[in-house]
């Protein structure tokens, strides 16, 4: 089955046909590093990590670019409020974002360009737009440069809007604009309110790039004038992605062939956002759940579906993933290890259908159910292929518990030290239970069993003694 994906631009599911056979170029808008990342922030990182893993599974040579916006109006405001240099705040928040991605086993992109490292490329692109009559320098002395939206008749085609139906671009003082919808390509330095370090030299005077030009320039540098897939959160469709496409194509760069957008995480029906006070940071969630459980929760939902966050739903997801882990643990004990395998047809078909992760996860659970039957029947030869298939499918989703990436404190399986502690405590309780049973004190034996069950430890009495696993 051909890999098919939903293209936001055409609003239909299309066969993926790369510009160059065997290769795939992917650009995803990364975060503006202004505050500590929360669950809503990292969903995009996880979703597009699954995309790059799937493309590689299909045999594509993937070049994956995920940028970092490290200079921005909000960064300047928040750094001033905290008494920090803007670059200090950006660096600190970038470190926290890196840790969050590590905790969720988000593989690094091929390149992760920062906006501040690519100002020359942005200036060149702005000059091209001015030369082609699609941009102009403001005449109010501000040093601003704007994209002339009315010079590009296709403006609005990504989101299917007419120019006259759009709201004004609230990214700069409108006095220097020919049309309120014109958006800033370059922002002149405001020496009375902005630090000198937040300005770069340009033909229009000191200043800094606008948000939209950053991504166009960086995508062009690392992927060329035309590339396969551009991704990001659904909230970026307008104005950010609309503006990216318009300025790139106006400069003669075809830009993206496909557009993919992941949906929000919501709480009480509203987008998770720090400004709304309804966000949850990654460290806060990882105090109760493992990184692999949070990733499973995010992966199990389709990337285009809004996720209403709740701890109850996260509890259910964690329980579901533990069932998979427990099966693999038991299978590994019987087999002495699990080798490489092949994903089942239902999983492959689901992933080829616009990254259908809900159906893909369901396929994994079905194979696990079959595997548990094989364990009960003692059919080791069939179990070997079954368990290997489960591992292969989990690996595609970044959820293989044996992946070394999950050995970190926030990661997948409990850290080695904690495993030792749990093993010792459970073994001690089992010894007490066996003594109680030998003394025919079944009330005490059952009480120990119930205590273990209450904290998620399942017992199985076998001829070789009791066996335990996490439920």
From Swiss-Prot:
GO molecular function: ATP binding; cysteine-tRNA ligase activity; zinc ion binding
GO biological process: cysteinyl-tRNA aminoacylation
Gene Ontology CC terms, in alphabetical order: cytosol
SMART domains: DALR_2
Main location: cytoplasm
Catalysed reaction equations from the record: tRNA(Cys) + L-cysteine + ATP = L-cysteinyl-tRNA(Cys) + AMP + diphosphate
Cofactor or coenzyme needed: Zn(2+)
Top-level EC class: ligase
Positions bound to Zn(2+): 29, 215, 240, 244
The record's free-text note on cofactor binding: Binds 1 zinc ion per subunit.
Localization annotation: Cytoplasm
Binding residues for ATP: 274
Keywords tagged on the record: Aminoacyl-tRNA synthetase, ATP-binding, Cytoplasm, Ligase, Metal-binding, Nucleotide-binding, Protein biosynthesis, Zinc
SUPFAM superfamilies cross-referenced by the UniProt entry: Anticodon-binding domain of a subclass of class I aminoacyl-tRNA synthetases, Nucleotidylyl transferase
EC number of the protein: 6.1.1.16
Sequence motif: 'HIGH' region, positions: 31-41
Keyword presence, Oxidoreductase: no
Chain span(s) of sequence motif 'KMSKS' region: 271-275
Subunit structure: Monomer.
Name of this chain's protein: Cysteine--tRNA ligase
Source taxonomy: Bacteria, Bacillati, Actinomycetota, Actinomycetes, Propionibacteriales
